[in-house]
């Protein structure tokens, strides 16, 4: 006969209830309190009691992992890929471990952007005081001075930060598929300036200050007997609450509060801020955007807010499985027409790369990214995106519009 851990923990409470139910009014009051306690105990939370400490390394070496020459994350000793279920039946602990590794990956990618891609980290807001919350973007040295071409990269929503397309790909597959580094390196090699946005860095977290409740003053007008009775009830309530908390969350994490970054409190705000303070000031005659997933929505919002400026400065936009919606975002007719001529959305599809895919919305053309995995669409469409930008630039130079509505591998350049 097997007895669950939760049953063993609750057994003393049940026995206690059985014993005190035979007593008088005071004992019945205790029974009521214990019943209330049992009704509020979350058995899933209760199981946290047996979790190992949520104390994880802060370096890749501490996790005993490293990226090999192919950019794959491998265990230093065994050479095996990352294992999520490090401890069986401890999903929450495994998830926290994964998140801790993810934070290290984010810092590692930041280092690669600076050291491997030679980008500089630029703090925003540009006029921030020393004490206020700040974010940052990455730029090539010639981002604002390159007279010809500028490429702007925007990732999707979630835990990803500047330089990443998908954390899952970085951890489980490789750096090439999961980061923006191949785009950055090729862009620099082909003479583009580069700006890497950081649209999910919207706030900083600080520990919530503890609120100290002052006890009632002895000089209160309340009768001493009534005050003593209230204090007794308060102490008993606190005791019951502490008893419950001990089981509910033995590894209670700190309560945090969010301090939002001025003018960068959302991906949409961030895109507009970077446009106003950097992209709009850039010397480049041709600006190109690559925007993945929610990044596409942020670009459409930017266009709604800065339509004339975007039309004047942006030559072409490559979207990858964008989640924008021209109806919900209330994009006007002139914006939809511009997008049809100057944008292309590489969507998740089992069709071959660049095959036309039907669209229900009257916005930009949709073609297959050559994969049905959402997070892989940027990487799989990588060569097609650069070809699209080259064609758009040449078409602009010769005063022609690129025929993006008919893009596929079967269409030759002469037909444009």
UniProtKB/Swiss-Prot annotation:
InterPro entries linked: AB_hydrolase_fold, Arb2, Arb2_dom
Cellular localisation: Nucleus; Cytoplasm; Endoplasmic reticulum
Motif Prevents secretion from ER per record, residues: 413-416
Transmembrane parts of this sequence: none
Disordered: region residues: 208-247
Cellular compartments per GO CC: endoplasmic reticulum; nucleus
Principal subcellular localisation of the protein: nucleus
Keyword Coiled coil annotated: no
Active-site residues, Swiss-Prot/TrEMBL: 293
Signal peptide residue numbers: 1-18
GO BP: any one term: regulation of alternative mRNA splicing, via spliceosome
PANTHER family xrefs: COTRANSCRIPTIONAL REGULATOR FAM172A (PTHR21357:SF3), FAM172 FAMILY PROTEIN HOMOLOG CG10038 (PTHR21357)
Family: Belongs to the ARB2A family.
Subunit structure: Interacts with AGO2. Found in a complex, composed of AGO2, CHD7 and ARB2A.
Protein's UniProt name: Cotranscriptional regulator ARB2A
Gene: ARB2A
């Amino acid at each position: 006969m097997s007895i669950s851990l939760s049953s063993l923990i609750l057994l003393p409470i049940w026995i206690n209830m059985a014993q005190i139910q035979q007593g008088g009014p005071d004992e019945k009051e205790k029974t009521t309190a214990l019943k209330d306690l049992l009704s509020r105990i979350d058995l899933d939370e209760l199981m946290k009691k047996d979790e190992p400490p949520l104390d994880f390394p802060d370096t890749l070496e501490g996790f005993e992992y490293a990226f090999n020459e192919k950019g794959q994350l491998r265990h230093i000793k065994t050479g095996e890929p990352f294992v999520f279920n490090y401890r069986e039946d401890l999903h929450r602990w495994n998830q926290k471990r994964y998140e801790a590794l993810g934070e290290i990956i984010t810092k590692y990618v930041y280092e690669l952007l600076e050291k491997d891609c030679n980008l500089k980290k630029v703090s925003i807001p540009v006029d921030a005081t020393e004490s206020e919350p700040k974010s940052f973007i990455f730029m090539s040295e010639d981002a604002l001075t390159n007279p010809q071409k500028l490429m702007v990269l925007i990732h999707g929503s979630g835990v990803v930060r500047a330089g990443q397309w998908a954390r899952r790909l970085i951890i489980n597959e490789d750096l090439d598929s999961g980061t923006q580094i191949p785009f950055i390196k090729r862009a620099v090699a082909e003479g583009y300036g580069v700006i890497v946005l950081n649209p999910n860095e919207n706030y900083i977290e600080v520990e919530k200050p503890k609120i100290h409740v002052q006890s009632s003053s002895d000089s209160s007008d309340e009768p001493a007997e009534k005050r003593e009775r209230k204090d007794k009830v308060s102490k008993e309530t606190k005791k019951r609450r502490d008893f419950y908390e001990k089981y509910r969350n033995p590894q209670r994490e700190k309560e945090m509060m969010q301090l939002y970054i001025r003018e960068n409190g959302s991906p949409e705000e961030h895109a507009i801020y970077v446009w106003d303070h950097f992209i709009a000031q850039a010397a480049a005659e041709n600006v190109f955007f690559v925007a993945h997933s929610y990044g596409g929505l942020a670009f459409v919002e930017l266009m709604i807010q800065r339509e004339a400026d975007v039309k004047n400065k942006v030559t072409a936009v490559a979207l990858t499985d964008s989640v924008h919606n021209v109806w919900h975002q209330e994009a006007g007719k002139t914006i939809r027409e511009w997008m049809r001529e100057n944008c292309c959305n590489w969507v998740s599809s089992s069709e071959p790369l660049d095959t036309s895919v039907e669209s229900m919305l009257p916005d930009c053309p949709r073609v297959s990214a050559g994969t049905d995995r959402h997070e892989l669409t940027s990487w799989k469409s990588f060569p097609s995106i650069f070809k699209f930008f080259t064609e758009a630039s040449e078409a602009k130079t010769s005063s022609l519009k690129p025929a993006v509505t008919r893009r596929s591998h079967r269409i030759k350049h002469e037909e444009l």
